[in-house]
């Protein structure tokens, strides 16, 4: 049984020292697409965290009963089932956001973070540790999404969560929104800048030269 210290390390590690986007550079595609607004970034974070945590839990519970030859198929079946549930919940209770997220909720099925944690961690680790690892990786993914979404929505549209923060010139204010920040390529450069800042502050995260 895992103790509290181990659980804390498993939960906080992916957020601080082993971030799936900043260190491992996984899950970047969806990060480029859903970060033009804080609302979509937050919902995507919750969706991926729920799927990653629950898939880790169920796969870990079944790990001793899954034949090695079909383990990837079983993992994808479990992940796909959870994604369908999440997608249906979003369409029922947050339809407008679900429309904005479009296919990217469905693409959680093939998200590198979810698949990677299922194969590399949940298949070898007890259920509670696997569940916390899923939450940690989801929150680590979300930390980058929300950071990028904050910059893109605030300076690209002058608002946060749809609430005007910077009064726009078109409405008689002073701020001229930077429309470039609302385009997907801007997220690529922002994520790159974040990774550069993190690796400057933490040199140990820089890959060793071969």
From Swiss-Prot:
Naturally occurring in which organism (per UniProt): Shewanella woodyi (strain ATCC 51908 / MS32)
One GO cellular component term noted in the UniProt record for this chain: plasma membrane
Keyword Ribonucleoprotein: no
Gene: nqrD
Residues annotated as transmembrane: 14-34, 42-62, 72-92, 103-123, 131-151, 178-198
Catalytic function, reaction form: a ubiquinone + n Na(+)(in) + NADH + H(+) = a ubiquinol + n Na(+)(out) + NAD(+)
Membrane topology of this protein: Multi-pass membrane protein
Protein name per the record: Na(+)-translocating NADH-quinone reductase subunit D
PANTHER family with a match to the protein in the record: ELECTRON TRANSPORT COMPLEX PROTEIN RNFE, NA(+)-TRANSLOCATING NADH-QUINONE REDUCTASE SUBUNIT D
């Amino acid at each position: 049984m895992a103790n509290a210290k181990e659980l804390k390390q498993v939960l906080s590690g992916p957020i601080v020292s082993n971030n799936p986007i900043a260190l491992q550079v996984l899950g970047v595609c969806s990060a480029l697409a859903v970060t033009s607004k804080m609302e979509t970034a937050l919902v995507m974070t919750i969706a991926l965290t729920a799927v990653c945590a629950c898939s880790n839990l169920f796969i870990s519970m079944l790990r001793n009963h899954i034949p090695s030859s079909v383990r990837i198929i079983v993992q994808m079946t479990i992940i796909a089932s959870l994604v369908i549930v999440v997608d249906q919940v979003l369409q029922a209770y947050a339809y407008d956001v679900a429309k904005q997220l479009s296919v990217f909720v469905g693409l959680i099925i093939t998200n590198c973070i979810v698949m990677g944690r299922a194969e590399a961690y949940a298949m070898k680790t007890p259920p509670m540790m696997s569940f916390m690892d899923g939450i940690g990786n989801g929150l680590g993914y979300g930390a980058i999404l929300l950071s990028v979404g904050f910059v893109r929505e605030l300076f690209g549209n002058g608002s946060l969560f749809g609430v005007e923060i910077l009064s726009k010139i078109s409405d008689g204010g002073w701020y001229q929104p930077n429309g470039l920040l609302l385009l997907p390529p801007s997220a690529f450069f922002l994520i790159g800048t974040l990774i550069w800042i993190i690796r400057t502050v933490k040199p140990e995260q820089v890959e060793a030269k071969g």
